[in-house]
Amino acid sequence: MENQAHTTAGASPCEAELQELMEQIDIMVSNKKLDWERKMRALETRLDLRDQELANAQTCLDQKGQEVGLLRQKLDSLEKCNLVMTQNYEGQLQTLKAQFSKLTSNFEKLRLHQMKQNQIHRKESSSKEELPFELSSLNQKLEEFRAKSREWDKQEVLYQTHLVSLDAQQKLLSEKCSQFQKQAQNYQTQLNGKKQCAEDSSSEIPRLVCESDPGCEATQRDEFIIEKLKSAVSEIALSRNKLQDENQKLLQELKMYQRQCQAMEAGLSEVKSELQSRDDLLRIIEMERLHLHRELLRMGEVQTAQDNRKRVESSYSPSPKEAERKRKELFPMVSDQPNHEKELSKMRSQLYQEEGLCSEQERLRSEISELTQELHQKEVTIATVMKKAALLERQLKIELEIKERMLAKQQVSDRRYKAVRTENTHLKGMMGDLDPARYLAVDLSNKKHSQCTSINKLEYENERLRSDLAKLHGNGKAAWPNQSSYGEAGAYVFQSQLKTETSGDRISQDCELNRSPTPLSPLPFQTKEMASPLVGDNEVLALSPPDISFRASLAAQHFLMEEERRAKELEKLLNTHIDELQRHTEFTLNKYTKLKQSRHI
């Protein structure tokens, strides 16, 4: 117990020391963390400041680049102007030289001519008075030419001074461009230096971290924190780059949208101008239409007034006798004129009223005649429409009756076909039940006779069905213009008839041979299909009864297979014909309903 107490007493101060050490370590670590955080913040602030400086330097570079571009444009424009000016100056110089050469040649000619004239005038005394006048004119011309040459010299001097000034401007601009380029290079070097400083600061971070606490390099926690800080710094830088890229993209998109808006505004302005021009044209056209309408109304009023005047004149013109009679009657009553003036005015008013009533009656008669003509035309059109409708109804009824008859015939043919099919199936069953031993029985002739009769019945029924089909096809050709399908059906019927004729000949031969008195003779089975041309009569007679029965069963099966195939083909043809008839009936019914609806409308 004492040993245990001693060990616990010895362990307790160690634990206390360890705890103190741990606390001191924690304090140191916290202090280091605080120092690192401060340093990281200081570094981040420095990085932000350097980024701002870089951005400012970049903006300055962009501005300088824009200024350089403007100066280059100015240089190009000045060079173009200089070239144009030099070309103009050279052209003017050439023209001046040409004019000067012409003037010199003319002057020499004039001088020679003057010398000749002087010689002539010296010889002649009469022409001495004219010499001073000509000399004065020549002197005036010389003075004019000298003035022009002085002006040309002045222009030449001005052009030369202008060229010198342009050269000086070009030199100044080239010097400015070189200065701007040097400034741009300086800014670029400054930017590169700042970038290198930033890289050095980012590389100094781990070095400072390592120098701050060389004793805690092995601690994983501090390394993890440092890595986190580095990753955070890199993420911040990446996010800034991304934001800058996004801002550039947004600026480009804004510029693009602004251009599109400008284009749309230009298009809208063009459309508005076009609409305004069209509105103006429409207004002008409307004004012209109104003016023409007014003129037409005025012309109509004038024409109606002229017509009324002509009618009044025509109404008064055919009654001169009555006017004379009235005058004769009124002549003796001149004394009673003041009394009869009122009566005359009343009579005139009555006459005017009667004329107005007559004109109205004529107008009403003309309107009534026009209305009667229109009614008559409408009645005629209604009668024609009713006749057409009645004819269409009759045609539709006839077509419906024909279709009903064809459907009835089709149903009858279907029934017959079903009966023939049942008989064929029954015959198949009978032929399947045949055995070689039963085939050699005594009642073989009766069975064969019954088979022949049933086969004859089937052939007769098939021929009748073919004739019905031919009739139906003929009716279908009359109703439908599609001839290609019916031609194929006719060809198929002709082929089937040929096949039935060949099979009928074969079966008739079998039946005639079956009616012979010997029931077990091998002759009924010597058909064209079974007997080969290389086999003789003795070989056929030497055949055994099982071989004969086997060959007979094969022939019957072959015949039944052909009949089934023909029946299927006939069924297909009938189905197609029924479908065509149904389509035609639907078409006619739709046509009839449309005609009824149009007539009701």
Curated annotation (Swiss-Prot):
Q: How does it assemble?
A: Interacts with CEP152; the interaction is mutually exclusive with CEP63.
* GO BP terms, alphabetized: cell projection organization; de novo centriole assembly involved in multi-ciliated epithelial cell differentiation; multi-ciliated epithelial cell differentiation
State its role: Key structural component of the deuterosome, a structure that promotes de novo centriole amplification in multiciliated cells. Deuterosome-mediated centriole amplification occurs in terminally differentiated multiciliated cells and can generate more than 100 centrioles. Probably sufficient for the specification and formation of the deuterosome inner core. Interacts with CEP152 and recruits PLK4 to activate centriole biogenesis.
Which residues does UniProt call coiled coil? 14-59, 86-196, 226-277, 354-397, 555-586
Q: Where is this region: Disordered?
A: 305-329
Read off the InterPro entries from this record: Cep63/Deup1_N (IPR031470)
Instruction: Give any extra note attached to this record.
Output: CEP63 and DEUP1 paralogs are both involved in centriole amplification: while CEP63 mediates mother-centriole-dependent centriole duplication, DEUP1 mediates de novo centriole amplification in multiciliated cells.
- Location of this chain's protein in the cell: Cytoplasm
User: What protein is this chain from?
Assistant: Deuterosome assembly protein 1
